[in-house]
Design a protein with these regions (language model features):
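A short, acidic/glycine-rich surface segment
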Residues: 2, 63-69, 108, 140-142
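Vicinal oxygen chelate
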Residues: 19-24, 81-130
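Core segments of cupin and vicinal oxygen chelate
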Residues: 18-62
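N-terminal beta-strand motif that seeds the catalytic metal site of vicinal oxygen chelate
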Residues: 1-23, 78-83, 137-146
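Residues that flank catalytic or metal-binding motifs in active/ligand-binding sites
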Residues: 11, 45, 54, 77-79, ...
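Short helix-capping and inter-helix turn/linker motifs at the boundaries of alpha-helical repeat units
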Residues: 6, 71-72
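Short glycine-/small-residue motifs
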Residues: 58, 132-133
């Protein structure tokens, strides 16, 4: 039996997303989700946003009118970004806010993920990137036990 190596990593540093409209996606993350801009690269252009735990880099595509949307069933790459929500009430309140946000397309409202107990909903943010928001009561219990 081969010995399992010790992991050389300890988490995700950031996720980079190419977006059609940097301004509307940045507004979605900051004004709708409450994230903060922690850096920018106007020459690219790009914005670095964070919720205090995770960082997402938003990269403006060069030619938005010629950008090709990601087909999750045909392309290799990021299927969706999944963000955790602390509790069920927070998930429901977030859904109400996100569903009304300009340019957001709701794929489905909060529902069980498979047979549960995780509850999630899926949207496309204003640039078309799929984002899942999820609450898992098993993680809530684990956090309480710390």
């Amino acid at each position: 039996m081969t010995e399992q190596p010790i992991p050389a990593t300890f988490g995700v540093d950031h996720v980079g997303l190419s977006v059609r409209d940097l301004a509307s996606t940045r507004a979605f993350f900051c004004d709708c989700l409450g994230w903060r801009v922690i850096g920018e690269r106007p020459d690219y252009p790009a914005a670095f946003v964070s919720d205090g735990h995770d960082m997402v880099t938003l990269w403006q595509v060069e030619a938005p009118d010629r950008a090709v949307a990601f087909d999750r069933r045909a392309n290799i790459g990021l299927h969706h970004l999944a963000l955790a929500v602390a509790d069920r009430a927070g998930l429901d309140a977030l859904y109400e806010r996100v569903a009304k946000w300009p340019g957001v397309v709701v794929e489905f409202a909060p529902e069980l993920s498979g047979k549960g107990p995780k509850i999630h909903f899926m949207i496309r943010e204003p640039s078309g990137v799929r984002i899942e928001f999820a609450f898992d009561p098993r993680l809530e219990e684990a956090r309480k036990q710390r």
